Amino acid sequence: MTRGVQIAASILNADLGALREAVQAAEQAGVDRIHLDIMDGHFVPNLTFGIATVEALRGVTSLPFDAHLMIANPALWAPRYAAAGCQTVAIHVEVPERHQGTLDAIRTAGAQAGLAADPGTPARAFAAHVAHLDFALVMTVKSGFGGQSYQPDAAARIKEIRVLLGAERLIHVDGGIRSSTAADAVAQGGDVLVAGTALFGAAQMRAAVEGLRPKA
């Protein structure tokens, strides 16, 4: 079941000196969403952008913003990203804190709440939180760096998480998504495909977007 697979452009792989133009180019190429990788230099070693960048880009497009928070203190920051204009906010299940309150706070702030999990995290980590989730963000590469390859066990993980979440909750798949891996991610239950290098590294972004969509 594809139920209208969506393509999210990860601007981590765009020209960071021209993010407004990158968002506009992605919209013109036909993507459905903009994916924002928020890194704090603590939960992951890299450091990217914060709320001020989200607010600046919010005026560039009406496309939904998906915030992927790779940060050590999501309880403090997650509701603020929702308030800044993100339609979805995902926090990492690996962060050692109680997640249900943060997920509920994201919803109260007006966004959909999600849990993200790295490849080494078992699917059962989602089980205790399903009632508080709108979606799962399944990482098919290690969080913190763009341009990695889709991991061999990705299909099995997506399928297992789909069974845990049931049919009604969405699964976003992030990492190594390109024309050669997109169909596999969708076949196992992915609803939103997050792509960066495959889009911003393409000669023709519109063709790259269409290359990720399921074929009729």
Residue ranges and their predicted role:
Residues I106, V186, A198-A216:
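C-terminal helical cap(s) of enzyme catalytic domains, especially alpha/beta-barrels
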Residues S10-A14, M39-G41, M70-P74, E94-P96, ...:
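Active-site beta-loop-alpha junctions enriched in small/polar residues
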Residues V5-S10, I34-L36, L57, F65-L69, ...:
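Hydrophobic faces of well-ordered beta-strands that scaffold small-molecule active sites
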